[in-house]
């Protein structure tokens, strides 16, 4: 690809939002801050991924089918929700990460309104002990080759 083709691909960049992600006014405000077009699509795993039109006119992902991304963002609104994923919803959470791993996808686990400091100091609403929570998160990142972003 020459520089003009690369620019055209970048100009066509859009974020795909999973159809299971809640379609709220707050979400629309968040999407507007991204500065790129947003389109809803059924993702096999994750809450967000990307799409773009290649120089041959084809899109990276055919959104008429379930999208199987190579890179995805799994968003949690806070540590409370993340703690629930490692306790009550663990099997569902694990299945999603296993599907991603089986397809060679890199998952970025985005936990909003949080920090390692808050996690380690138990500043969340759950009876999940801070040491067990930190150990679960760390093991998860290694097991599924994921990255955690606060």
Q: What are the roles of these predicted feature ranges?
A:
Residues 1-25, 29-30, 137:
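Interdomain/boundary linker segments immediately adjacent to catalytic/signaling cores
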Residues 24-28, 37-45, 50-150:
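Extended, alpha-helix-rich binding/interface surfaces that flank or overlap catalytic cores
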């Amino acid at each position: 690809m020459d520089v003009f083709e690369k620019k055209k691909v970048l100009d066509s960049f859009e974020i795909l939002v999973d159809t299971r992600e809640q379609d709220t006014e707050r979400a629309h405000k968040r999407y507007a801050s991204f500065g790129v077009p947003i389109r809803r699509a059924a993702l096999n795993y994750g809450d967000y991924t990307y799409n773009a039109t290649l120089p041959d006119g084809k899109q990276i992902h055919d959104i008429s089918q379930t999208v199987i991304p190579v890179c995805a963002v799994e968003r949690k609104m806070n540590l409370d929700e993340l703690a629930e994923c490692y306790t009550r919803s663990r099997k569902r959470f694990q299945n999603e990460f296993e599907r991603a791993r089986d397809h060679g996808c890199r998952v970025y686990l985005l936990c909003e309104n949080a920090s390692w400091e808050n996690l380690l100091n138990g500043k969340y609403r759950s009876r999940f002990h801070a040491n067990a929570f930190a150990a679960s998160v760390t093991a998860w990142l290694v097991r599924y080759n994921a990255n955690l972003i606060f």
